[in-house]
Structures are given as C-alpha cells and as structure tokens.
Amino acid sequence: MRLAAVALVGLVLVAAGCGGGGDSSTTAGGCEDVDAPAPREDGGRSAPNEELDATKTWTLTFDTSCGTFVVTLDLDSAPKTAASLVSLARAGYYDDTIFHRIVPGFVIQGGDPTQSGNGGPGYTTVDPPPAGAAYTKGVVAMAKTATDAAGTAGSQFFVITGDGSGIAPEYAVAGTVTSGLDVVERIGELGDPTTEEPLQPVVIHSVTVGSDT
C-alpha cells in the first residue's frame, strides 16, 4: 500500500521514476544536474529505544543537490518521531535518496530509499499531533497511510512549501525548517504539477544530526 500523502484534493504518493541527470554541473535554477541514485531496499530496522535529551535543541542538516537546509526537530510535539529521524539519519538511511514527490506551491516529499512511495524503515512510531496543528510553510511532517492512526510515522517526510491550511491535523509534526527555506522553495519549483514527479532528480546527499550542548 502506498503512503497517503497530504493533499489539497486527495493527492497520493507517486513513484519518482526520475531519469538520468548529468555530470554534476549546475543548472540555471542553482541545483546540481545529477543522476538519480539507484533505488535500494528498505525495512529491516527496529524502532530506537533511546530517547533524545529534551534539554537540547536537535537539528537535521540536509545536504542536497539544490543546497543545504536545516530542520529543528520538535521534541515537544513528536519525541518518538524525532528520535526515529535522528536514528535513521545517523545510520545513513537518507543518504543518496531523492525527493520522489514534488508538488509546486504545496509540498516536497522524500525519505523513501525505494523511490516508489511505498518504502519505510520496517517500523512506525506514533506521536498524535496537537489539536489545531498548523502546517505552514517550512513545517516538516510525516507521511502515513490512509488507514494509519493520526501521528503515525515511518521514514517518509514532507516539507510544506506553500499553503497548507487545508491539511487536517493528522500528521506528526517533526519540526520546522529554520535555515535554508530558500533551498526548500527552490526544490519545490522542480515538480510537475500534474504528475507530482520531479522534473529533474533532487538528491539528498546526506543528513547530519546536530545538538547544542
């Protein structure tokens, strides 16, 4: 079953199906012209048992073919989701993956090594979103299947790039882009509004975990 993504009119995840890119030159939009990495298997992981230190500020730095952006995790709203994202990032789960779904003016979505829209780490966590959760530009939340309970999360995430006011509060709020929102917006321009597929591969080279002391 494919993950049911947030939507304006019931949009669902689609397979990326990105073709070849180029020789790592830079395109007019400021993104590297790169080849999409080969899809790889997912699953087989267990949910982390370790809780994050809530006295610290935890961040994820995404190094992508369109630049770098930083997400500050929301441990108050989604502590289990945050711990899972940190664990997956430290394990290199997100390295050399793509944004397989890009809807201009709405969301960019990634976190699936299989590039099919079906992938996940082999487990889920649940952090019910707070009542009245607002999915505004720059908010990072977790995709789930249509039948999953509110706040269910695997590895796939989406970043709001436009008006998310119509999104029901059903998706775990992982955090907010606190640096590099222009990079997120740049990525958000590289999708086909009809198919929701990327017009060129946008690769996540690596995700680095940070925390203050």
Model regions and ranges:
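Cyclophilin-like peptidyl-prolyl cis-trans isomerases
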Residues: 2-213
